[in-house]
């Protein structure tokens, strides 16, 4: 199956429409949204696309600005999703077990430092190492994330090193552990064009693309 995985729309409805139209042209069969959606118009497009979503840091503070229907949608979002062969999150899949949706986080805001829940993975940092270890222990080869507004990928090598990948097309090899940043639809910080990722789970191939 071929998926489009996108994140960080930040109220940019036109950019999201470009991504959705571009993805359809690529023969995409399913969508995932990794948070920081923004206004009601953008939420409506995500929901119309049938895209399972996770919440990002925008939703943590921005959900009260949505319509009542979309507030309920946002408050029910999880911080990460575990599919059969890949995981998806806004920033990290390592969350306290009692925080299973945005409403739980809102009820426990004083007890949870948000900086730990929304790390930036575009450089080699302790959070990235912790995620790689967690993926390896779970025998999970692939994580997609947003939040950094940059397209990039890291591979955990057999000799326990982190390798930053520079290609826009990446093949998931047997034994690999990959962390892939899909970039930003609405506010990319690594060049022009609305950025997102395509993943073909039959070919085991990731493409970092722009609409």
Please provide the spans of the model-predicted regions:
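Glycine-rich phosphate-binding loop signature in dinucleotide/nucleotide-binding domains
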Residues: 23-28, 83, 136-139, 198
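Short, electropositive, low-hydrophobicity segments enriched in small/polar residues
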Residues: 11, 19, 39, 60, ...
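Beta-strand-turn-beta hairpins that frame and shape the catalytic cleft
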Residues: 1-4, 81-88, 172-179
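A structural micro-motif
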Residues: 1, 49-51, 141, 177, ...
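Conserved catalytic scaffold of divalent metal-dependent phosphoesterases
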Residues: 41-144, 148-158
């Amino acid at each position: 199956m071929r998926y489009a995985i996108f994140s960080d729309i930040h109220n940019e409805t036109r950019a999201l429409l470009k991504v959705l139209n571009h993805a359809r042209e690529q023969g995409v069969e399913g969508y995932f949204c990794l948070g920081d959606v923004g206004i009601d118009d953008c939420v409506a497009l995500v929901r119309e696309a049938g895209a399972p979503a996770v919440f990002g840091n925008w939703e943590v503070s921005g959900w009260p600005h949505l319509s009542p229907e979309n507030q309920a949608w946002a408050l029910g979002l999880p911080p990460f999703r575990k599919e059969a062969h890949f995981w998806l999150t806004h920033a990290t899949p390592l969350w306290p077990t009692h925080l299973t949706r945005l409403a739980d986080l809102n009820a426990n805001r004083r007890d949870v430092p948000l900086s730990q829940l929304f790390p930036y993975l575009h450089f080699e940092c302790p959070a990235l190492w912790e995620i790689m270890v967690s993926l390896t222990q779970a025998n999970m080869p692939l994580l997609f994330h947003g939040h950094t507004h940059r397209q990039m990928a890291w591979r955990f090598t057999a000799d326990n090193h982190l390798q930053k990948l520079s290609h826009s097309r990446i093949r998931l090899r047997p034994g690999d552990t990959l962390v892939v940043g899909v970039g930003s639809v609405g506010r990319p910080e690594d060049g022009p064009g609305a950025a997102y990722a395509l993943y073909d789970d039959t070919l085991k191939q990731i493409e970092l693309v722009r609409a």
